[in-house]
A protein has these predicted regions:
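Structured interaction patches on ligand/partner-binding surfaces of diverse proteins
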Residues: 41-42, 62-95, 99, 132, ...
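Short Pro-Gly-centered beta-turn/loop motif in secreted/extracellular proteins
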Residues: 45-56, 62-63, 123
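Substrate-binding/active-site clefts of carbohydrate-active enzymes
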Residues: 199-205, 215-456, 460-461, 482, ...
Length: 689
């Protein structure tokens, strides 16, 4: 949620006076597809590497009193006035890749931007834990006043410790767990191990996001499919071997977290070869992540076979877990050497390359971008590729990319012409692709094919829902049609397989969208990823009562809009890992408290539950967020995992957590609230740190 001055003044008025947080200055550097934020220290320069391109800078967390900053442009070595209490947003265009310094002068509240003349040493950003006012737990027994929530004689059980207490004279007395981060989770005793009193609702969904390639390799026989290589270095952008069989093998682990749905990164066939990784071309970058599609109708061999997906759906459903596939409709994958050779697209100077083009490696004076020297980007033979009736691309005879969200080439990827009413035929190389299900259909448009290819996964396998990539870059009418077609496909699959369940569910990614209702919900979306909460997690992990305003705001908004469902997260593949911010297992545990008690659905990124470390990333930071899932844990991480399991299962037992009425209970020594949905009622207490 972007905050304006009015919103901030209202939130300030609602905040608990005794728990006002200290100001924490923050710089967010964002592109159209990802972002990263950094702590700003007064009078200490922040040096970060930036590649050529356009960015949006947001400076927030500045306290004090100051006049509103005027409209201004960023100029080198020129102080820029900042707002107090209201974020300052500035466009930034970088012409030359390099290291850049941001100097915040707290005394006069300005930011100065400087290009570093020498390369700065690589810095690990570890934030100081926010200095916020917070309740303090002195140890021993605590007394909680619950007279307004439960009648005398009611037996309650703390999910964290297993203690059973009885409400007497409106109060309960118990000793919190020393390892819970000050958290007490009270539920009626008879429901502590029982089925939920309310049916499942996606507003309480706990969604586990798996990047399939980096999760678990259960079938090494499919590694290196299509002639893909390791690089023998840090393996930043290569396939690591994770597959669908690996997800199946770890379903019990996923279930133990109270998971309701698994969001799989895209598993359809990806481009076979590499492109250069990072601005400097320092590593070969393959489509291990799944967002560079070659064929939308088949599973990539690195990830497995149809039988594996069938088994995964069956075994997940047996555990009460739904399967969400990641659907990409905005763009196709890059033209790599491997694909150009296989598909006989005659735009390459073959004598410059080895017999198998994907075996190419840069020489000592080249980098991984240098393969472009063998490709003729002015050749008329590019018509043999996707073709100008299918995509926008900077190629001869193709429609030029535009500047709008709909017509731009996102990250230089070929942009499907989903708005075109023209009937098209799939390119010949795709019709000839081994194992493809693509067939030419009379009078089909680009959007017709893409909708059919995506919904066919639902019809064949009983997929429960989609996570939709890059929503704002495709027309709303296309999303409405996809939702209708997928809904019909799931109903047909269930009829054929004698099954029932919730209607097809669609979650969208609209970059920067917060926990509010927007017209995107009229385009078939049941939920949107909530980009608002990630930075609020810092203070919430430092002290849970700092989430009071967030919880109150979200719960009120959910009550006002019955079709609204924000999906909140703390880590993602396009931003950062929460653990990387503080490198603190205690903060990771406390962040679980803040996230899993948030109204609305929540998303756990694989490894959040064991504080997964970032991997190597060269000059592309977001590669580090896709590190391999660790499967061996020391005692401290096992304790962290146990905490996530206890909290996740508590949330799963009680749909009131995500979907219920939220009401605070005033206490002198704790932050306490109830969540109620029909007969389902729980009390959450934070007694301090």
């Amino acid at each position: 949620m972007k905050l304006n001055a009015l919103t901030l003044s209202l939130l300030s008025a609602l905040a608990l006076p005794a728990l006002a947080s200290a100001s924490t200055a923050n710089l967010t550097v964002a592109t159209t597809t990802n972002s990263r934020d950094f702590p700003l220290q007064a009078d200490e320069p922040l040096v970060i590497p930036l590649t050529k391109g356009d960015y949006t800078l947001t400076i927030s967390g500045i306290g004090g009193d100051c006049p509103p900053a005027p409209e201004q442009e960023i100029k080198f070595n020129t102080p820029i006035a900042l707002n107090c209490h209201v974020p300052t947003q500035l466009p930034l265009s970088i012409r030359f890749t390099g290291d850049y310094a941001f100097q915040w002068q707290a005394q006069n509240n300005t930011l100065t931007f400087v290009r570093q003349t020498t390369k700065a040493a690589k810095t690990e950003f570890r934030r100081p834990i926010p200095n916020v006012s917070c309740e303090v737990y002195q140890g021993g027994e605590v007394t909680l006043d619950l007279a307004s929530s439960f009648a005398d004689g009611t037996e309650l059980q703390d999910a964290m410790t297993g203690q059973v207490v009885t409400v007497e004279q409106g109060k309960v007395r118990l000793t919190p767990s020393a390892n819970s981060g000050g958290l007490v989770l009270l539920e009626p005793k008879q429901t502590a191990k029982a089925e939920p009193k309310q049916p499942f609702t996606y507003r309480n969904a706990n969604i586990y996001f798996v990047m399939v390639d980096r999760f678990y390799n259960a079938d090494p026989s499919n590694d290196g499919s299509y002639g893909r290589h390791k690089d023998g270095q840090e393996e930043i952008g290569t396939f690591h071997g994770g597959d669908l069989k690996g997800v199946i093998a770890k379903l019990d682990h996923i279930q133990s977290l109270g998971t309701d749905a698994i969001w799989l990164s895209p598993i359809v066939e990806q481009v076979h070869g590499f492109v250069g990784g990072g601005e400097k071309g320092s590593f070969p970058f393959y489509a291990y992540h799944g967002y560079w599609t070659r064929d939308f109708t088949k599973i990539d061999a690195n990830f497995g076979k149809d039988e594996d997906l069938q088994t995964l759906v069956r075994e997940a459903h047996r555990r009460g877990i739904k399967i969400l596939m990641d659907a990409v409709i905005n763009h196709a994958g890059y033209a790599t050497l491997a694909d150009l050779q296989q598909d006989a697209v005659l735009v390459v100077n073959a004598p410059m390359l080895p017999e198998r083009w994907n075996d190419w490696k840069p020489s000592a004076d080249e980098n991984w971008h240098s393969f472009h020297q063998a490709i003729d980007y002015q050749s008329k033979n590019w018509q043999q590729w996707w073709g100008p009736d299918w995509v926008r691309a900077g190629l001869p005879g193709y429609p030029a990319p535009g500047s709008s969200d709909i017509t731009m080439n996102l990250a230089g990827l070929p942009d499907f012409r989903t708005e075109s009413p023209q009937a098209v035929t799939p390119p010949q190389w795709l019709l000839n692709n081994p194992g493809t299900r693509v067939v030419s259909k009379p009078n089909y448009t680009v959007a017709d094919y893409l909708i059919e290819w995506q919904s066919d996964w639902v019809r064949r396998f009983g997929i429960d829902g989609f996570r939709i990539d890059t929503v704002k870059h495709v027309e709303g009418e296309v999303w409405q049609r996809l939702k209708q077609r997928a809904t019909e496909s799931l109903a047909a699959w269930r009829k054929d397989n004698n099954q029932s369940g919730e209607p097809f569910w669609m979650m969208g990614e609209v970059w920067g969208h917060g926990a509010y209702r927007s017209p995107y919900f009229d385009d078939g979306f049941d939920a949107l990823i909530n980009f608002d909460i990630q930075k609020r997690m810092d203070n919430g992990a430092a002290c849970l009562s700092q989430m009071a305003m967030v919880y109150r705001d979200y719960a009120q908004t959910l009550a006002k809009y019955p079709d609204l469902n924000p999906v909140s997260y703390m880590s993602s593949h396009d931003t950062e890992l929460f653990f990387g911010r503080f490198k603190s297992l205690d903060m990771q545990r406390n962040a679980a408290n803040a996230l899993l008690l948030t109204p609305g659905a929540i998303q756990v990124y694989y490894g959040d539950e064991v504080a997964r470390e970032a991997g190597p990333y060269a000059d592309d930071f977001h590669q580090g967020t896709r590190s391999d899932m660790p499967w061996e844990w020391n005692a401290e991480r096992q304790a962290l995992l146990k905490h996530w399991q206890t909290l996740g299962q508590f949330r799963q037992r009680h749909p009131a957590i995500g979907a219920g009425d939220h009401r605070e209970i005033a206490q002198s020594n704790a932050y306490v609230f109830t969540r109620t949905l029909g007969e389902d009622k729980v009390v959450v207490a934070f007694v301090g740190r």
